[in-house]
């Protein structure tokens, strides 16, 4: 179970990306990072999300807390994978709002983990997730506005 949680975010987004690839856009926002940066950022974000979630679950003795962590974790993965599907079908408005919800969910997840009294130093490694989702929301918003 430990390795499944660690690699689940990476594998789920990788597999979803194979079935629902993100297309190229006619309009590229000026603040968009180069294409190679996306694979580096998502690899770090997904592996850190899985690794830190695994660490927190293994440190918990309370099954209710484990269940809460897993519920938020699975919901966040559902949102992140859902964006790929919506974006693939060019549902830009819906994918924009899904990114906003994903960003808020990631912040709730980080706050929940930081409320637990162990491993607080690992929370810092999750901070790129909401920042990246804010950037992705901005990029998606520009693409949505351009394609209206």
Language-model region placement:
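N-terminal membrane topogenic signal
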Residues: 1-8
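Alpha-helical transmembrane segments of multi-pass membrane proteins
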Residues: 10-24
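Membrane-interface helix termini and inter-helical loops of multi-pass transporters
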Residues: 22-32, 60-62
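Membrane-interface loop-to-helix entry segments
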Residues: 35-47, 89-102
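Helix-adjacent hinge/juxtasegments
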Residues: 53-88
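Membrane-interface helix caps and helix-loop-helix hairpins in membrane proteins
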Residues: 63, 84-96, 115-120, 143-147
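Hydrophobic alpha-helical membrane segments
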Residues: 72-83, 95-111, 132
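Terminal transmembrane helical module of multi-pass membrane proteins
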Residues: 112-148
């Amino acid at each position: 179970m430990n390795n499944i949680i660690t690699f689940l975010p990476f594998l789920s987004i990788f597999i979803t990306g194979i079935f629902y690839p993100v297309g190229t856009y006619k309009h590229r926002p000026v603040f968009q990072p180069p294409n190679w940066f996306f694979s580096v950022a998502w690899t770090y974000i997904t592996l850190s999300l899985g690794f830190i979630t695994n660490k927190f679950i293994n440190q918990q003795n309370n099954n209710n807390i484990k269940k809460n962590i897993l519920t938020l974790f699975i919901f966040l993965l559902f949102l992140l994978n859902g964006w790929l599907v919506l974006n693939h079908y060019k549902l830009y408005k819906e994918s924009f709002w899904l990114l906003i919800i994903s960003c808020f969910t990631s912040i709730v997840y980080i706050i929940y983990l930081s409320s637990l009294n162990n491993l607080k130093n690992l929370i810092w490694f999750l901070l790129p997730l909401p920042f990246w989702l804010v950037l992705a929301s901005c990029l998606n918003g520009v693409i949505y506005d351009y394609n209206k």
